[in-house]
UniProtKB/Swiss-Prot annotation:
It comes from Aspergillus fumigatus (strain ATCC MYA-4609 / CBS 101355 / FGSC A1100 / Af293) (Neosartorya fumigata). May be involved in a process influencing telomere capping. Its main location: cytoplasm. SMART domains: TLDc. Pfam families: TLD. Residues 322-343 are annotated as: Disordered. It is found in: Cytoplasm. Residues 354-570 form the TLDc domain. Belongs to the RTC5 family. It comes from the Eukaryota. This is Restriction of telomere capping protein 5. The gene is rtc5.
């Protein structure tokens, strides 16, 4: 790993160290621009420790550069530095983790780390995200270094190579201006695939496959709960981090109350990972299942964190000289002046949330997509506009209808309460929610005709606490039925999400019934809710949660509601590039509807309904009100759905 340039010495080509170096060169040319490599080299070499010509980073340098709190800090509520260093040391040995990990953090190792953690692996990993999950598990699991037997010939070759090559890292030849050998865009991509496939076959990139080649010791490895908890707490703090934002913007105000909220949220996420059959640790099967289905954006904070490597404050690109850039002799010291306050996804409005704490928003970003893109909620330039809250607007369906049914955009429903004593699960606080990317409809028993083409357009039902559970939307067209809307509202039965709506009846009041794997119903007083979840059922709006095993029974929780909030999903008002300025925003449309309702209410007050039978004015007025659906008792006239 300390070889600075590619060599073609006889017998040296097949060694893991040399192949790892060649792969690092390929990573650099395929995944970074020349300008990014220039910044990367400056960041690395200006801070690297030089020991006998070998330049590398240690844990302290890595933590200080990234701004991650570690045990060296006097006040250290987040001790995530050792966890990140452990991950980086493992990933730096890719694709020979079993033989070379933990690796010394040379420039070559850091190049591979940056590619893998900034999600630039599309051109070097054939299975992309699936391979990344395996690598992330290995970087966190307690896997020992494998003893590799080498033949005497190989030992002699390595000894000769060590005598002829100086152990120093000077960067890659391809970083020089003349990098035509590796930078040709017309290079045969098939050769790359074959080369990378050969590299994969030499080590454990497919170590978790269920076949005879599986390394049992690695497969049976576990991630300790303490290790994952420290990493989750870091992610909950830096989840809103944007590219090139200083991490201290989010780690400088970690008071006791904030840390308590972060610990609580981390424990609810940890509860999703099954540890019963893993000797107290988290198995690969559980890790892969949860991170790919229930927490698909969990590791997204690593991308902006490690993108700091690709921008150096020491490079003054405004000054031109013979070289392309000018590098200062000293490292720029961070300013002591307070920086800007971190941005928030919650827009100011009619109320302040009692549920959407910063740690809860971070938790939501680990699995909720942006309605306009496949990025997570915090990365998709979306904001949450306050629409309805029982704490402010009261527990009234009339108020709910006035505020929610007039909102012409997607919504996020959040509910917090206590599980009633009558419930089979006893007492305890619970936080539930529903992500509804389509607007509510006021037409009775109507169903959106939109056929979602991606996951961001699908609804989902979730439990945030005491255990993270996600019921994803069912993409099957067969579940799109008029009597099975995603969300339904009625002044007679209340709110129903993921239920089957019964036909209207004059003789009795029929309530919505659960359909499929999950549902949520709220009564007409907005004071009680019922949460239903099953490990089976693919005929409804929601699919079974990944965290539920087939042996678990159906869960039904009766909840006494403390607070229920509805948040509207709107584009970032400050982002004018993605919005159509000629189009009215959902806030403006809602305000226009309210003004129209106010005018109609004033008009109705002026109608004379006290005239005698057969009065044309009275009949016309009554016809107008019936047409608007404000009076009359025709079946199915009251209610609305999504």
């Amino acid at each position: 790993m300390g070889v600075g340039q590619s060599t073609e010495l006889p017998g040296h080509v097949g060694t893991p160290e040399h192949l790892s170096h060649v792969l690092a060169e390929r990573f650099a040319t395929k995944c970074f621009t020349p300008l990014e490599l220039t910044h990367f080299k400056d960041n690395f070499f200006s801070r690297a420790i030089d020991q006998g010509g070998l330049k590398y980073w240690n844990e302290k340098i890595l933590s200080d550069f990234l701004g991650i709190p570690d045990s060296s800090d006097s006040h250290c509520p987040l001790d995530a530095g050792p966890v990140i260093f452990r991950m980086v040391s493992y990933l730096g040995a890719f694709p020979f983790q079993n033989t070379l990990a933990p690796s010394v953090l040379t420039f070559e190792a850091m190049v591979k780390v940056a590619v893998l953690l900034t999600e630039r692996y599309g051109r070097v990993l054939r299975r992309g995200r699936k391979d990344r999950i395996k690598l992330l598990f290995g970087s966190l699991a307690d896997v020992g270094r494998r003893n590799v037997s080498t033949s005497p010939d190989t030992e002699d070759v390595c000894r000769e190579t060590d005598d002829t090559v100086k152990p120093h890292v000077t960067g890659f030849e391809v970083d020089a201006p003349a990098n035509d050998d590796y930078g040709d865009e017309d290079e045969d991509e098939d050769d790359d695939d074959l080369a990378l496939a050969a590299l994969e076959s030499l080590d454990a990139i497919d170590v978790f496959k269920h076949d005879s080649r599986v390394d049992k010791k690695v497969y049976e490895a576990r991630i300790s709960v303490a290790t994952l908890r420290r990493l989750l707490m870091l992610f909950l703090v830096i989840a809103p981090l944007k590219t090139l934002e200083p991490v201290t913007l989010y780690t400088s105000d970690l008071n006791e109350a904030r840390m308590e909220s972060i610990r609580k949220e981390a424990d609810t996420i940890l509860a999703a990972f099954s540890t019963e059959d893993s000797d107290g640790g988290i198995s690969y099967r559980s890790f892969a299942n949860i991170t790919s289905t229930a927490l698909p954006y969990l590791f997204d904070p690593l991308t902006p964190l490690f993108e700091h490597l690709l921008f150096s404050k020491n490079l003054d690109m405004t000054k031109k000289s013979r070289s392309d850039a000018t590098v200062t002799d000293t490292i720029e010291k961070p300013s002591d002046s307070p920086g800007p306050s971190p941005s928030t996804i919650v827009l100011p409005g009619g109320f302040e949330s009692s549920i959407l704490k910063p740690s809860v928003v971070s938790h939501l970003s680990f699995f909720l997509p942006s309605p306009t893109s496949n990025a997570n909620l915090l990365r998709g330039n979306m904001r949450l506009h306050p629409v309805f809250s029982t704490a402010v607007h009261g527990s009234s369906l009339t108020s709910f209808s006035h505020n929610v049914l007039t909102w012409n955009a997607g919504t996020l429903l959040l509910l917090e309460g206590a599980v009633s004593e009558s419930s089979e699960h006893g007492e305890g606080m619970v936080t539930l929610g529903a992500y509804l990317p389509q607007p509510w409809k006021s037409a009775p028993l109507s169903h959106s005709s939109t056929k979602p083409s991606d996951s961001s357009a699908l609804p989902c039902l979730f439990e945030l606490s005491p255990k993270h559970q996600l019921l994803q939307g069912n993409p099957s067209p067969s579940v799109q039925k008029p009597n099975a809307p995603v969300a339904y509202f009625s002044t007679s039965t209340g709110i129903a999400i993921g239920c089957q709506i019964p036909p209207p009846s004059r003789s009795q009041l029929l309530t919505p019934t659960p359909l499929g794997a999950g549902s949520l119903t709220v009564d007409t007083s907005l004071e009680s809710a019922t949460f239903y979840m099953s490990s089976i059922g693919h005929n409804g709006v929601f699919l079974p949660p990944a965290t539920t095993s087939m042996s678990e029974e159906t869960v039904r929780k009766q909840i006494d509601i403390y607070t229920m909030e509805i948040w509207g999903l709107v584009p970032d008002p400050s982002d004018t590039s993605s919005s159509d300025l000629s189009r009215q925003s959902p806030v403006e449309l809602q305000r226009a509807k309210w003004e129209f309702e106010a005018r109609e209410a004033e008009r109705r007050r002026n109608l004379n309904l006290k005239a005698g039978a057969g009065d044309p004015a009275a009949e016309g007025a009554r016809w107008l009100l019936e047409t608007a659906g404000l009076i009359g008792d025709r079946p199915g006239q009251r209610g609305g759905s999504l």
